[in-house]
Regions:
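Charged, glycine-rich active-site and insertion segments that engage polyanionic ligands
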Residues: 1-53, 139-141, 148-318
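Clamp-loader machinery-focused feature within the broader ASCE/P-loop NTPase space
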Residues: 1-125
Length: 318
């Protein structure tokens, strides 16, 4: 919860105002802590003075919608407390089920809250079903939509919600999170995680947990070398491992994207165009990667080619 003082002030000011808006969009890049904020804010919203409050997961007036496990095997992993793969979207059936639960009044007080984590992952039918509830909210019900890319939401949904924006954290705040959550990190990994975080402590933690320091070093080398003999691209395939899961693949793409973003801040006009084109290619790759089962070697070769394309030509280097 580091670095969100402005968001808390806006939220608590709205609560104190007596006319709390029923729909809220928590907008900002992934990994800033929006979902954690939503849980804490929702619990604060529904709490009644003098009424004991159950733990969040057991609270009858707090609902969290997120993509379900991908299959029965992943359900078992979830139930066993293990990491599990989810479906790509929140389904319309999930939204409708919540709608049925909201037909009654809140249980412990006058308010209840529904957290959608995240609004970017709603099926088309689910968006329409949610929109109906936003247009005619059930009594005492408040919606908090965690959204990584605001432009993906329909304008009709955005127009019915207050937008609470979350901004990237400073390098110092990201480092505070890293030191608190992973104090065992060596200095090289800490520096690499900070370099690709882009103000997102979640991105820094994912990078460190996945052990992608070697990848980031190769990424940086590729931005300075056209890699004519493909040696660096070959090294990428070995660095990510033989069978990386989807989370590791996505973390690798995001680390490459943020390596380009960081280079953009130091580039001259001539280099900037190549970097922008490489960035666009990485964004497109991130969009299709969850849908297609990429061979890890092919994926890393494509990432490496995009980075190498942004490196200076021999003529440009002169």
């Amino acid at each position: 919860m580091i670095g969100h003082d402005d968001a808390w002030r806006a939220w608590r000011s709205a609560m104190a105002g007596g006319r709390m808006h029923h729909g809220w969009i928590l907008s900002g890049r992934e990994g800033l802590g929006k979902a954690s904020f939503a849980r804490a804010a929702a619990a604060e919203l529904v709490a009644e003075p003098g009424v004991p409050q159950p733990a969040f997961e057991m609270h009858p007036d707090l609902y969290v919608l997120r993509p379900l496990p991908a299959n029965d095997d992943e359900v078992k992993k979830r139930d066993d407390g293990k990491p599990y793969v989810t479906k790509r979207n929140i389904s319309v059936d999930q939204i409708r089920e919540i709608g049925r639960r909201l037909n009654t009044r809140p249980t412990l007080g006058a308010r209840r809250a529904v957290i959608v984590d995240c609004g970017d992952q709603l099926e088309k039918g689910a968006v329409n079903a949610l929109l109906k509830m936003l247009e005619e909210p059930p009594q005492g019900t408040f919606f908090l939509l965690v959204v990584h890319v605001l432009g993906r939401l329909l304008p009709t949904v955005r127009s019915r919600c207050q937008i609470l924006r979350f901004h990237p954290l400073s390098d110092a705040d990201v480092m505070r999170v890293l030191d608190a959550e992973m104090p065992q990190l060596d200095n090289e990994t800490r520096a690499a995680a900070l370099a690709v975080a882009g103000g997102s402590p979640g991105a820094a933690l994912t990078f460190a947990e996945q052990g992608l320091g070697k990848l980031q070093a190769i990424y940086s080398a590729l931005l300075g070398d056209r890699d004519g003999d493909l040696a660096l691209r070959g090294a990428l395939a070995g660095a990510i491992g033989a069978r990386p899961d989807r989370e590791r693949q996505m973390a690798a793409i995001e680390a490459a994207r943020m390596t380009v973003v960081r280079a953009l801040g130091q580039a001259d006009d001539h280099a900037r165009l190549r970097l922008v084109e490489a960035h666009a290619g990485l964004v497109s790759l991130a969009a299709v990667a969850p849908t297609y089962n990429f061979d890890s070697g092919l994926l890393m070769t494509q990432i490496g080619s995009l980075l190498a394309s942004a490196a200076p030509t021999r003529e440009g280097a002169r």
